Protein backbone atom coordinates (compact mmCIF):
# COMPACT_ATOMS: atom_id res chain seq x y z
CA UNK A 1 0.00 0.00 0.00
CA UNK A 2 1.34 3.44 -0.92
CA UNK A 3 1.71 5.73 2.07
CA UNK A 4 0.01 9.11 1.72
CA UNK A 5 2.61 11.68 2.70
CA UNK A 6 0.07 14.52 2.56
CA UNK A 7 -1.22 13.84 6.05
CA UNK A 8 -3.08 16.91 7.30
CA UNK A 9 -5.91 17.05 9.84
CA UNK A 10 -7.12 20.30 8.24
CA UNK A 11 -6.80 19.48 4.52
CA UNK A 12 -10.06 20.01 2.63
CA UNK A 13 -11.99 21.21 5.67
CA UNK A 14 -14.24 24.25 5.61
CA UNK A 15 -14.20 26.84 8.39
CA UNK A 16 -17.85 27.75 8.94
CA UNK A 17 -18.12 28.10 12.73
CA UNK A 18 -15.73 27.80 15.65
CA UNK A 19 -17.78 25.04 17.27
CA UNK A 20 -16.62 22.66 14.52
CA UNK A 21 -13.04 22.73 15.84
CA UNK A 22 -11.29 21.47 18.96
CA UNK A 23 -9.26 23.67 21.29
CA UNK A 24 -6.05 22.07 19.99
CA UNK A 25 -7.03 22.77 16.38
CA UNK A 26 -7.90 26.41 17.06
CA UNK A 27 -4.67 26.92 19.01
CA UNK A 28 -2.69 25.37 16.16
CA UNK A 29 -4.21 27.83 13.67
CA UNK A 30 -3.52 30.72 16.06
CA UNK A 31 0.11 29.66 16.53
CA UNK A 32 0.51 29.07 12.79
CA UNK A 33 -0.77 32.62 12.25
CA UNK A 34 1.89 33.95 14.63
CA UNK A 35 4.52 31.95 12.73
CA UNK A 36 3.39 33.28 9.35
CA UNK A 37 3.38 36.81 10.76
CA UNK A 38 7.03 36.34 11.75
CA UNK A 39 7.86 35.04 8.27
CA UNK A 40 6.11 38.03 6.70
CA UNK A 41 8.00 40.49 8.90
CA UNK A 42 11.29 38.76 8.03
CA UNK A 43 10.53 38.86 4.31
CA UNK A 44 10.59 35.06 3.99
CA UNK A 45 8.31 33.75 1.19
CA UNK A 46 5.68 31.13 2.04
CA UNK A 47 3.91 30.25 -1.22
CA UNK A 48 1.96 27.27 0.10
CA UNK A 49 -0.91 27.87 -2.35
CA UNK A 50 1.08 28.43 -5.54
CA UNK A 51 -1.19 28.13 -8.57
CA UNK A 52 -4.45 28.02 -6.58
CA UNK A 53 -7.48 30.16 -7.46
CA UNK A 54 -9.58 31.63 -4.65
CA UNK A 55 -13.12 33.03 -5.00
CA UNK A 56 -13.99 35.86 -2.63
CA UNK A 57 -17.79 36.12 -2.37
CA UNK A 58 -19.10 39.27 -0.71
CA UNK A 59 -22.82 39.82 -0.18
CA UNK A 60 -21.85 42.26 2.58
CA UNK A 61 -19.28 44.99 2.03
CA UNK A 62 -15.97 44.82 3.82
CA UNK A 63 -12.66 46.60 4.31
CA UNK A 64 -10.65 44.31 6.58
CA UNK A 65 -12.01 40.93 5.47
CA UNK A 66 -11.59 41.65 1.77
CA UNK A 67 -8.14 43.17 2.26
CA UNK A 68 -7.04 40.31 4.51
CA UNK A 69 -8.18 37.54 2.16
CA UNK A 70 -6.71 39.32 -0.87
CA UNK A 71 -3.26 39.93 0.63
CA UNK A 72 -3.22 36.51 2.32
CA UNK A 73 -3.97 34.82 -1.01
CA UNK A 74 -1.27 36.74 -2.84
CA UNK A 75 1.32 36.12 -0.11
CA UNK A 76 0.53 32.40 -0.36
CA UNK A 77 1.01 32.46 -4.13
CA UNK A 78 -2.68 32.13 -4.98
CA UNK A 79 -4.87 34.26 -7.23
CA UNK A 80 -7.90 35.87 -5.52
CA UNK A 81 -10.98 36.83 -7.53
CA UNK A 82 -13.48 39.23 -5.94
CA UNK A 83 -17.19 38.64 -6.60
CA UNK A 84 -19.37 41.35 -5.07
CA UNK A 85 -23.11 41.53 -4.47
CA UNK A 86 -23.70 42.50 -8.12
CA UNK A 87 -21.71 39.49 -9.34
CA UNK A 88 -23.31 36.69 -7.34
CA UNK A 89 -26.94 35.60 -7.34
CA UNK A 90 -27.23 33.39 -4.27
CA UNK A 91 -30.86 32.32 -4.11
CA UNK A 92 -32.00 35.11 -6.44
CA UNK A 93 -31.41 34.18 -10.07
CA UNK A 94 -29.48 31.03 -9.22
CA UNK A 95 -29.70 28.70 -6.25
CA UNK A 96 -26.86 28.69 -3.75
CA UNK A 97 -26.33 25.00 -4.52
CA UNK A 98 -25.95 25.63 -8.26
CA UNK A 99 -23.57 28.52 -7.61
CA UNK A 100 -21.52 26.28 -5.32
CA UNK A 101 -21.15 23.60 -7.99
CA UNK A 102 -20.06 26.12 -10.63
CA UNK A 103 -17.55 27.91 -8.41
CA UNK A 104 -16.22 24.63 -7.02
CA UNK A 105 -15.40 23.49 -10.55
CA UNK A 106 -13.32 26.62 -11.21
CA UNK A 107 -11.84 27.62 -7.86
CA UNK A 108 -9.77 25.76 -5.27
CA UNK A 109 -11.27 27.57 -2.28
CA UNK A 110 -14.16 29.94 -1.55
CA UNK A 111 -14.49 32.75 0.98
CA UNK A 112 -18.08 33.78 1.74
CA UNK A 113 -19.20 36.91 3.59
CA UNK A 114 -22.95 37.28 3.69
CA UNK A 115 -26.16 37.11 5.65
CA UNK A 116 -27.30 33.50 6.03
CA UNK A 117 -25.21 30.84 7.74
CA UNK A 118 -27.14 28.30 5.67
CA UNK A 119 -25.63 29.77 2.48
CA UNK A 120 -22.12 29.17 3.82
CA UNK A 121 -23.10 25.61 4.71
CA UNK A 122 -24.59 24.92 1.26
CA UNK A 123 -21.48 26.31 -0.44
CA UNK A 124 -19.32 23.99 1.67
CA UNK A 125 -21.59 20.99 1.04
CA UNK A 126 -21.93 21.35 -2.72
CA UNK A 127 -18.75 23.04 -3.97
CA UNK A 128 -16.32 20.24 -3.14
CA UNK A 129 -13.68 22.76 -1.99
CA UNK A 130 -12.91 24.42 1.36
CA UNK A 131 -15.25 27.29 2.21
CA UNK A 132 -14.20 29.94 4.72
CA UNK A 133 -16.83 31.99 6.53
CA UNK A 134 -15.78 35.64 6.36
CA UNK A 135 -18.88 36.61 8.40
CA UNK A 136 -22.54 35.65 8.55
CA UNK A 137 -25.31 36.93 10.78
CA UNK A 138 -24.59 34.07 13.21
CA UNK A 139 -20.82 33.52 13.34
CA UNK A 140 -17.51 35.25 12.55
CA UNK A 141 -14.79 32.59 12.82
CA UNK A 142 -12.05 34.38 10.89
CA UNK A 143 -12.39 37.33 13.27
CA UNK A 144 -11.95 34.96 16.20
CA UNK A 145 -8.68 33.56 14.89
CA UNK A 146 -7.33 37.11 14.68
CA UNK A 147 -8.79 38.10 18.05
CA UNK A 148 -7.36 35.23 20.04
CA UNK A 149 -4.09 35.50 18.12
CA UNK A 150 -3.92 39.12 19.32
CA UNK A 151 -4.68 38.06 22.89
CA UNK A 152 -1.98 35.38 22.82
CA UNK A 153 0.48 37.81 21.24
CA UNK A 154 -0.07 40.23 24.12
CA UNK A 155 -0.26 37.82 27.06
CA UNK A 156 1.71 34.79 25.86
CA UNK A 157 -1.19 32.48 26.72
CA UNK A 158 -4.96 32.10 26.45
CA UNK A 159 -6.19 29.75 29.16
CA UNK A 160 -7.29 31.45 32.35
CA UNK A 161 -7.53 34.97 30.91
CA UNK A 162 -10.81 36.90 31.09
CA UNK A 163 -12.37 38.75 28.15
CA UNK A 164 -15.37 41.03 28.63
CA UNK A 165 -17.57 41.95 25.67
CA UNK A 166 -19.75 45.05 26.15
CA UNK A 167 -22.63 45.91 23.84
CA UNK A 168 -25.04 43.90 21.69
CA UNK A 169 -24.70 40.42 23.16
CA UNK A 170 -26.70 38.82 20.33
CA UNK A 171 -24.51 39.81 17.39
CA UNK A 172 -22.18 37.48 15.50
CA UNK A 173 -19.02 38.72 17.23
CA UNK A 174 -20.50 38.21 20.70
CA UNK A 175 -21.72 34.74 19.68
CA UNK A 176 -18.32 33.79 18.37
CA UNK A 177 -16.41 35.22 21.33
CA UNK A 178 -18.62 33.33 23.78
CA UNK A 179 -18.20 29.98 22.04
CA UNK A 180 -14.54 30.34 21.03
CA UNK A 181 -13.51 31.48 24.50
CA UNK A 182 -15.40 28.54 25.99
CA UNK A 183 -13.53 26.14 23.69
CA UNK A 184 -10.12 27.66 24.46
CA UNK A 185 -10.53 28.00 28.22
CA UNK A 186 -10.79 31.79 28.19
CA UNK A 187 -13.33 33.22 30.65
CA UNK A 188 -15.93 35.19 28.69
CA UNK A 189 -18.15 37.86 30.23
CA UNK A 190 -20.97 39.32 28.12
CA UNK A 191 -22.18 42.65 29.53
CA UNK A 192 -25.37 43.79 27.81
CA UNK A 193 -28.97 44.82 28.47
CA UNK A 194 -31.13 41.77 29.23
CA UNK A 195 -32.97 42.25 25.93
CA UNK A 196 -29.67 41.81 24.09
CA UNK A 197 -28.33 38.74 25.89
CA UNK A 198 -27.07 35.90 23.65
CA UNK A 199 -29.76 33.40 22.70
CA UNK A 200 -30.31 30.39 24.92
CA UNK A 201 -29.10 28.16 22.08
CA UNK A 202 -25.78 30.02 21.83
CA UNK A 203 -25.36 30.01 25.60
CA UNK A 204 -25.94 26.26 25.71
CA UNK A 205 -23.34 25.61 23.01
CA UNK A 206 -20.82 27.68 24.98
CA UNK A 207 -21.68 26.02 28.29
CA UNK A 208 -21.03 22.60 26.78
CA UNK A 209 -17.51 23.61 25.79
CA UNK A 210 -16.87 25.49 29.05
CA UNK A 211 -17.56 22.34 31.06
CA UNK A 212 -14.64 20.67 29.27
CA UNK A 213 -12.21 23.62 29.21
CA UNK A 214 -12.91 25.12 32.63
CA UNK A 215 -13.80 28.51 31.16
CA UNK A 216 -16.09 30.62 33.34
CA UNK A 217 -18.97 32.27 31.49
CA UNK A 218 -20.80 35.30 32.88
CA UNK A 219 -23.75 36.94 31.13
CA UNK A 220 -24.97 40.01 32.98
CA UNK A 221 -26.38 43.51 32.65
CA UNK A 222 -24.27 44.65 35.61
CA UNK A 223 -21.09 46.49 34.60
CA UNK A 224 -19.30 45.95 37.91
CA UNK A 225 -19.88 42.20 37.82
CA UNK A 226 -18.99 41.84 34.15
CA UNK A 227 -15.85 43.95 34.13
CA UNK A 228 -14.23 42.80 37.37
CA UNK A 229 -10.94 40.99 36.77
CA UNK A 230 -11.03 41.36 32.99
CA UNK A 231 -7.82 41.32 30.92
CA UNK A 232 -9.49 42.23 27.63
CA UNK A 233 -12.35 44.69 27.21
CA UNK A 234 -13.93 44.23 23.79
CA UNK A 235 -16.74 46.04 22.00
CA UNK A 236 -18.35 46.23 18.58
CA UNK A 237 -20.68 48.58 16.73
CA UNK A 238 -24.10 48.96 18.32
CA UNK A 239 -26.00 48.44 15.06
CA UNK A 240 -24.89 45.60 12.79
CA UNK A 241 -24.89 45.59 8.97
CA UNK A 242 -28.41 45.38 7.61
CA UNK A 243 -30.02 46.80 10.76
CA UNK A 244 -31.51 50.29 11.00
CA UNK A 245 -32.76 50.65 14.58
CA UNK A 246 -30.21 53.29 15.61
CA UNK A 247 -32.38 55.29 18.00
CA UNK A 248 -33.43 52.23 20.01
CA UNK A 249 -29.86 50.90 20.22
CA UNK A 250 -28.34 54.22 21.25
CA UNK A 251 -30.80 54.41 24.16
CA UNK A 252 -30.29 50.76 25.14
CA UNK A 253 -26.52 50.66 24.87
CA UNK A 254 -25.29 54.08 26.00
CA UNK A 255 -24.80 52.73 29.56
CA UNK A 256 -22.58 50.00 28.04
CA UNK A 257 -20.13 52.32 26.32
CA UNK A 258 -16.45 51.43 26.85
CA UNK A 259 -14.91 54.47 28.53
CA UNK A 260 -12.09 54.98 31.00
CA UNK A 261 -14.44 54.39 33.91
CA UNK A 262 -15.26 50.96 32.46
CA UNK A 263 -11.56 50.16 32.02
CA UNK A 264 -10.94 51.09 35.67
CA UNK A 265 -13.81 48.88 36.85
CA UNK A 266 -11.73 45.85 35.80
CA UNK A 267 -9.32 46.47 38.69
CA UNK A 268 -6.65 44.90 36.46
CA UNK A 269 -3.08 46.30 36.41
CA UNK A 270 -2.35 48.33 33.29
CA UNK A 271 0.22 45.85 31.98
CA UNK A 272 -2.40 43.07 32.11
CA UNK A 273 -5.23 44.98 30.41
CA UNK A 274 -5.99 45.69 26.75
CA UNK A 275 -8.89 47.04 24.68
CA UNK A 276 -10.04 45.40 21.43
CA UNK A 277 -12.55 46.24 18.70
CA UNK A 278 -13.19 44.39 15.43
CA UNK A 279 -13.78 47.74 13.61
CA UNK A 280 -15.10 49.95 12.17
CA UNK A 281 -15.56 52.00 15.34
CA UNK A 282 -17.67 55.08 15.98
CA UNK A 283 -15.36 56.84 18.43
CA UNK A 284 -15.53 60.41 17.06
CA UNK A 285 -17.28 62.53 14.42
CA UNK A 286 -14.68 62.08 11.66
CA UNK A 287 -17.07 59.96 9.57
CA UNK A 288 -20.38 60.67 7.84
CA UNK A 289 -22.08 58.26 10.26
CA UNK A 290 -20.43 59.98 13.20
CA UNK A 291 -21.71 63.38 12.08
CA UNK A 292 -25.24 62.03 11.53
CA UNK A 293 -25.29 60.41 14.98
CA UNK A 294 -24.18 63.68 16.57
CA UNK A 295 -26.93 65.61 14.76
CA UNK A 296 -29.67 63.09 15.63
CA UNK A 297 -28.73 62.03 19.15
CA UNK A 298 -26.31 64.68 20.40
CA UNK A 299 -23.47 62.23 21.10
CA UNK A 300 -19.97 62.37 19.64
CA UNK A 301 -18.91 58.84 20.61
CA UNK A 302 -20.80 55.56 20.59
CA UNK A 303 -19.56 52.13 21.66
CA UNK A 304 -16.11 53.41 22.71
CA UNK A 305 -14.77 56.81 23.67
CA UNK A 306 -11.95 58.35 21.70
CA UNK A 307 -9.95 58.43 24.93
CA UNK A 308 -9.97 54.63 25.21
CA UNK A 309 -9.63 54.09 21.44
CA UNK A 310 -6.39 56.10 21.37
CA UNK A 311 -5.09 54.95 24.77
CA UNK A 312 -2.21 52.68 25.79
CA UNK A 313 -4.74 49.86 26.17
CA UNK A 314 -5.81 49.93 22.51
CA UNK A 315 -4.89 46.95 20.32
CA UNK A 316 -7.53 47.25 17.59
CA UNK A 317 -5.05 47.96 14.80
CA UNK A 318 -2.82 44.99 15.72
CA UNK A 319 -6.04 42.98 15.77
CA UNK A 320 -6.95 44.25 12.28
CA UNK A 321 -3.52 43.37 10.88
CA UNK A 322 -3.79 39.92 12.43
CA UNK A 323 -6.85 39.26 10.27
CA UNK A 324 -4.44 38.76 7.37
CA UNK A 325 -1.95 36.53 9.19
CA UNK A 326 -4.61 34.32 10.78
CA UNK A 327 -6.61 34.00 7.54
CA UNK A 328 -3.39 33.05 5.79
CA UNK A 329 -2.81 30.30 8.36
CA UNK A 330 -6.36 29.00 7.93
CA UNK A 331 -6.14 28.97 4.12
CA UNK A 332 -2.72 27.30 4.05
CA UNK A 333 -3.74 24.67 6.60
CA UNK A 334 -6.95 23.70 4.81
CA UNK A 335 -5.75 23.94 1.21
CA UNK A 336 -1.94 23.74 1.17
CA UNK A 337 -1.32 19.97 1.53
CA UNK A 338 0.93 20.71 4.50
CA UNK A 339 2.20 17.97 6.79
CA UNK A 340 0.00 18.33 9.89
CA UNK A 341 -0.72 14.72 10.91
CA UNK A 342 -1.99 15.67 14.37
CA UNK A 343 -2.46 18.66 16.69
Swiss-Prot record:
Carbamoyl phosphate binds at residues 62-65, 89, 113, 140-143, 278-279, 323. Ni(2+) ion bind each monomer of the trimer. Its main location: cytoplasm. Ni(2+) binds at residue 79. One of its GO terms (biological process) is arginine biosynthetic process via ornithine. GO terms for cellular component: cytoplasm. The gene is arcB. Its EC number is 2.1.3.3. Pathway: Amino-acid degradation; L-arginine degradation via ADI pathway; carbamoyl phosphate from L-arginine: step 2/2. Its cofactor is Ni(2+). It catalyses: carbamoyl phosphate + L-ornithine = L-citrulline + phosphate + H(+). It is found in: Cytoplasm. The keyword Metal-binding applies. The C-terminal end of the protein is critical for the stabilization of this oligomer. This is Ornithine carbamoyltransferase, catabolic. Belongs to the aspartate/ornithine carbamoyltransferase superfamily. OTCase family. L-ornithine binds at residues 172, 236, 240-241. One of its GO terms (molecular function) is metal ion binding.
